Amino acid sequence: MSIPPVIFLPIFFYSSFVQAFNAPECIDKGQYFASFMELENEPVILPCPQINTISSGYNILDILWEKRGADNDRIIPIDNGSNMLILNPTQSDSGIYICITKNETYCDMMSLNLTIVSVSESNIDLISYTQIVNERTTGEMVCPNINAFIASNVNADIIWSGHRRLRNKRLRQRTPGIITIEDVRKNDAGYYTCVLKYTYGDKTYDVTRIVKLEVRDRMIPPTMQLPDGVVTSIGSNLTIACRVSLRPPTTDADVFWISNGMYYEEDDEDGDGRISVANKIYTTDKRRVITSRLKINPVKEEDATTFTCMAFTIPSISKTVTISIT
């Protein structure tokens, strides 16, 4: 009887075979909610999106990056793989990138959409970051989407340009990447450019961000007229008027009354209908006035308390009246 030959597999081959056989199936978590639009020929950093959602008890052994349907030779893993870097991207680097995290028992992956565009006036709105400040206030303009580049470098070199208002003393860069604007004016609106100097290896690259600054109309706070106190008697019919004046751009407010945790609104009577609210509105070219009348009929001893007239708007305002009974 012949003895079948014994086949000895190299240890490394056997180990690889077992690992491949036992490798967990990778869970596809879909595409990250945010898309990335970056400039051609400037460094791009993409984050591994599922890193921040992984529980503390999960031990990651490997973080891998790949581009769907293409070679991965343009991808540079950085920060222990939690981010990926492309140094000189071209429009051909646009596409879907996948971050894979795994250990011996678990694997998941999530994709990100990257679009590389050139700098031109025709697509400036596509690549700019809109920021909003209010007229006649102190506002801030921030160089956006640069945290991954500066990391622990709190003294990053960031230069602003592109708008003549940067020469005005009201605009000051007190913190790297942040412009403080004192007494914001309408003509502060426009496009601003900030450039970060990023060093990788022995070479320095420009990272450019364009901010589209919008200035909202000056917010004029509403005014309210309400007496500090009123004197009445039990059994009488009492009406207290609260007058709210609004100026553009604020043209609407929800006006109601509060007392001892109870809310009194128009068309909403209390249990016995003794306390009610009626609102009247009139409008002119320059303002809108809401007169809210709190009606108590008849007055009872329990009404000797405070009632607050509240105008819910931006910004909100309130005043309180005290009812005294003689």
Curated annotation (Swiss-Prot):
Protein name: Interleukin-1-binding protein
Major localization class: secreted
Its biological purpose: May reduce the host inflammatory response by interacting with inteleukin-1 beta (Il1b) and thus decreasing the association between IL1B and its cellular receptor.
Matches recorded under PANTHER family: INTERLEUKIN-1 RECEPTOR FAMILY MEMBER, INTERLEUKIN-1 RECEPTOR TYPE 2
GO terms (BP aspect): symbiont-mediated perturbation of host process
Similarity annotation: Belongs to the interleukin-1 receptor family.
Gene3D superfamilies xref list: Immunoglobulins (2.60.40.10)
Ig-like C2-type domain location: 24-115, 122-208, 221-322
Cleaved signal peptide residues: 1-18
The protein's assembly and partners: Interacts with mouse Il1b.
Keywords noted in UniProt: Disulfide bond, Early protein, Glycoprotein, Host-virus interaction, Immunoglobulin domain, Repeat, Secreted, Signal, Viral immunoevasion
Native source organism of the sequence: Cowpox virus (strain Brighton Red)
Glycosylation sites: 80, 103, 113, 237
Cellular localisation: Secreted
Coiled coil residues, start to end: none
